Amino acid sequence: MNSPLVVGFLACFTLIAAIGAQNAFVLRQGIQREHVLPVVALCTVSDIVLIAAGIAGFGALIGAHPRALNVVKFGGAAFLIGYGLLAARRAWRPVALIPSGATPVRLAEVLVTCAAFTFLNPHVYLDTVVLLGALANEHSDQRWLFGLGAVTASAVWFATLGFGAGRLRGLFTNPGSWRILDGLIAVMMVALGISLTVT
């Protein structure tokens, strides 16, 4: 359980599974069975780039300023707990996700929209670059093993979400499904945030 690979997988999975604009878009594409592979690939490759940037950048920062780790660690813990509380609020008041119309959309339009959901969301930089970078660098020489775990979680999540959505078409239009998923996310995020403050 203390393996950087496992910790990286769990940390990334906990963050990435929060239902936001990007995941809702991937889910809709999966439910509609439209351009699923390119969307999953774009999301995964984007995370690989962002995770690597976070690990590389924070490695240099912490090498020059070791005390910065404490600031990032407690800031990250507060962010995780806050995000967990937001997930708990969504679980309290879930909303069904209804697939939109049946008119096919061109691949280029879908990819541009997916890129916008990915890179125009400020949380992607906080989650993927800042927070995962800081968590990875707690493992010093094994930070890239943490990164490998995080990248694996990203690939598993987006592939499962995109390709699994078509099979769960009826389930994810039900608000109760969001309640369960967001409830689990809330528990995992708050637990990870608390663990950061005590390590």
UniProtKB/Swiss-Prot annotation:
GO terms for cellular component: plasma membrane. One of its GO terms (molecular function) is amino acid transmembrane transporter activity. The keyword Lipid metabolism does not apply. Keywords: Amino-acid transport, Cell inner membrane, Cell membrane, Membrane, Transmembrane, Transmembrane helix, Transport. Pfam families: LysE. Induction: Positively regulated by LysG in the presence of lysine or histidine. It comes from the Bacteria. The chain crosses the membrane at residues 6-26, 42-62, 68-88, 144-164, 178-198. It is a multi-pass membrane protein. Its main location: membrane. InterPro entries: LeuE-type (IPR001123), Lys/arg_exporter (IPR004777). It is found in: Cell inner membrane. The keyword Cell membrane applies. GO terms for biological process: amino acid transport. NCBIfam families: 2a75. Belongs to the LysE/ArgO transporter (TC 2.A.75) family. Catalyzes the efflux of L-lysine. This is Lysine exporter LysE.
